[in-house]
A protein has these predicted regions:
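Local cysteine-cluster metal-coordination motifs and their immediate loop/turn environment
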Residues: 45-57, 85-101
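Immediate flanking context of iron-sulfur cluster ligation sites
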Residues: 38-46, 69-91
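Short flanking/linker segments adjacent to small metal-binding domains or redox-active Cys/His motifs
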Residues: 94, 99-105, 125-157
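Extreme N-terminal basic, low-complexity initiation segments
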Residues: 1-10
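Ferredoxin-type iron-sulfur electron-transfer modules in oxidoreductases and energy-metabolism complexes
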Residues: 64-81, 113-114, 119, 123
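Polybasic, low-complexity association/targeting segments
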Residues: 29-54
Length: 157
């Protein structure tokens, strides 16, 4: 459609076959530059849409990660946060998982997220976007980010 972002179809991968009606509708945006049109640096909130969060496979039902993505996408997002669905964050035992990253910043992977956590996740992403290095002071981090952190990855470069 005019004005839509370029996208690529999910075809399965990383051992996760694209099955069920949810897989046909899921589209992953093509990579975008990390700088907004105003010159501010944006951060990316990656959401694993294939996370089943310990539930058995059900081809007719959207996985918990996909439900989380829908919940996040339905909310107003912070201006410097881009939400990108991904097929797998390799946190299957701790799904649904999200990851925060940005140029020159520490990156984080968080697990055990639910659709009900969406407002807090976006608040945490906004706090992350407001930092120069990706490190939100411990006491200022939202509780779910303090308690559900799976990994902290140093900046690349």
């Amino acid at each position: 459609k005019p004005g839509d972002l370029p996208a690529q179809e999910l075809t399965g991968g990383r051992g996760v076959p694209a099955r069920g009606s949810w897989a046909i509708r899921a589209r992953v945006p093509a990579p975008l530059p990390a700088i907004t049109d105003l010159g501010r640096m944006t951060v990316t909130l990656h959401v694993c849409i294939t996370c089943r969060a310990g539930e058995p496979a059900n081809d007719a039902m959207l996985p918990k990660g996909g439900q989380l993505h829908q919940s996040l996408d339905a909310l107003e997002r912070p201006p410097d946060v881009r939400i990108v669905p991904v097929e797998c964050l390799s946190a299957c035992n701790n799904g649904a998982a999200v990851a925060l990253s940005g140029p020159g910043r520490w990156s984080y992977v968080y697990g055990r997220m639910t659709p009900a956590d969406a407002p807090e996740i976006l608040a945490g992403a906004a706090a992350y976007a407001a930092t120069a290095d990706g490190i939100v002071p411990w006491r200022e981090r939202i509780a779910i980010f303090r308690k559900r952190s799976l990994a902290r990855i140093p900046p690349i470069g």
